[in-house]
């Protein structure tokens, strides 16, 4: 089985877009079980001593079953301090995109589930560490990621039939629902189509992280500068 893990390193946003990254001193997540590995991290919160993440929790040897978990991790050691299972429906869930509401405790999760027929939104109760279904955003879409831009919301995702290759864009006037059902094909290539994380804002410029899948899923990450959306 392929084994994935999460690593932490110190950098500022400008380092990430200038290729000035020092990967010589990575703190790796200390897995709590040899049967579990973690992938697709999205940062929920950072304090002086801990990092809170939403991640894909993969149960090795389980015929592609994965859950969405909240991990609280020691920043210095990579040790998991707390773990909460949020979405577990006995199929493969991954890529837990975080959407923040108007208050600090208003959090929504949009996980990828390419085995489902829908892209669903869950409201996360951060006090009780529980999720409830909030809405259905679209028919199934892979690695859905949303960019607010000039008063509208643009959702980028690949299709289930070409999940590493065909990147589409949907639009809406609301971040959580109302996306049009006739997406625009943006890119069709194994290089740089599938999303690799949330959009980055650095010095008033927006960047789109994407995967290099020419040699297989997750073989590399590319950054694209977003110049305009129309």
Where are the model-predicted features located?
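Carbohydrate-active catalytic/glycan-binding domains of CAZyme proteins
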Residues: 1-230
């Amino acid at each position: 089985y392929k084994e994935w893990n999460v690593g932490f390193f110190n950098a500022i946003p400008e380092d990430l877009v200038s290729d000035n990254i020092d990967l010589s001193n990575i703190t790796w997540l200390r897995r709590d079980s040899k049967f579990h590995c973690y992938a697709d991290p999205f940062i929920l919160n950072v304090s002086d001593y801990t990092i809170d993440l939403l991640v894909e929790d993969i149960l090795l040897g389980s015929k592609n079953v994965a859950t969405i978990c909240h991990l609280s991790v020691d920043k210095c050691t990579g040790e998991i301090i707390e773990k909460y299972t949020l979405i577990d429906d006995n199929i493969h869930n991954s890529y837990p995109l975080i959407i923040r509401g108007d208050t600090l405790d208003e959090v929504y999760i949009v996980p990828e589930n390419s085995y489902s027929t829908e892209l669903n939104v869950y409201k996360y109760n951060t006090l009780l560490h529980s999720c409830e279904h909030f809405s259905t955003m679209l028919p199934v879409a892979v690695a859905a990621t949303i960019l607010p831009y000039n008063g509208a919301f643009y959702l980028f995702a690949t299709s289930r039939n070409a999940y590493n290759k065909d990147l589409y864009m949907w639009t809406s006037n609301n971040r959580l629902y109302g996306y049009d059902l006739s997406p625009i094909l943006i890119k069709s290539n194994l290089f740089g189509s599938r999303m690799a994380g949330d959009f980055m804002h650095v010095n008033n410029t927006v960047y789109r992280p994407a995967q290099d899948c020419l040699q297989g899923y997750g073989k590399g990450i590319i950054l694209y500068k977003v110049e305009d959306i129309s």
